[in-house]
Regions:
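Non-catalytic interaction/assembly regions
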Residues: 5-10, 23
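Long, terminal "pre-/pro-" and other extracytoplasmic accessory regions
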Residues: 1-7, 116, 121
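Generic detector of isolated residues embedded in canonical secondary-structure elements
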Residues: 13-14, 107
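N-terminal segment of the canonical double-stranded RNA-binding domain
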Residues: 14-102, 114
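Ampiphathic alpha-helical segments that act as solvent-exposed interaction surfaces
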Residues: 101-121
């Protein structure tokens, strides 16, 4: 059974902090190009990127983390098993696969991201 998203964040604090910093940096970059009111920008920056936000992203759309890991030389690929069963998915990280198969793409992505947290930590 996979860990809860909040457990992943707690188990890999160094990775969590690096990821939080990455998303905050991206938020700041987007504000520099955005015409949003200054008070809105300040409010969003003061909130930062919470563990709850990261946990929701991990559960609902784990591929949002792929760019973070790419920049840290942890490259995730999610593939279909075209040789044995094309209805199954598996992942590779830096060309290596754990040999685990998934019936749906999102659980496969989540497992890959969890492994990437471990590697980044």
């Amino acid at each position: 059974m996979p860990k809860l998203a909040i457990e992943v964040l707690n188990d890999y604090p160094l990775a969590t902090e690096a990821i939080r910093d990455w998303f905050l940096k991206k938020m700041i970059e987007s504000f520099e190009q955005d015409n949003a009111p200054e008070d809105f920008k300040k409010q969003m920056l003061s909130r930062g990127v919470s563990d709850i936000t990261l946990a929701i992203m991990l559960d609902q759309s784990p591929r949002n983390f792929f760019d973070v890991f790419d920049e840290n030389k942890i490259v995730i690929e999610v593939l279909r098993d075209t040789d044995i069963n094309p209805d199954l998915f598996y992942y590779k990280i830096n060309g290596k696969t754990p040999g685990t198969f998934f019936e749906q793409r999102i659980p496969c992505e989540r497992a890959a991201v969890e492994k990437a947290f471990e590697l980044l930590n």
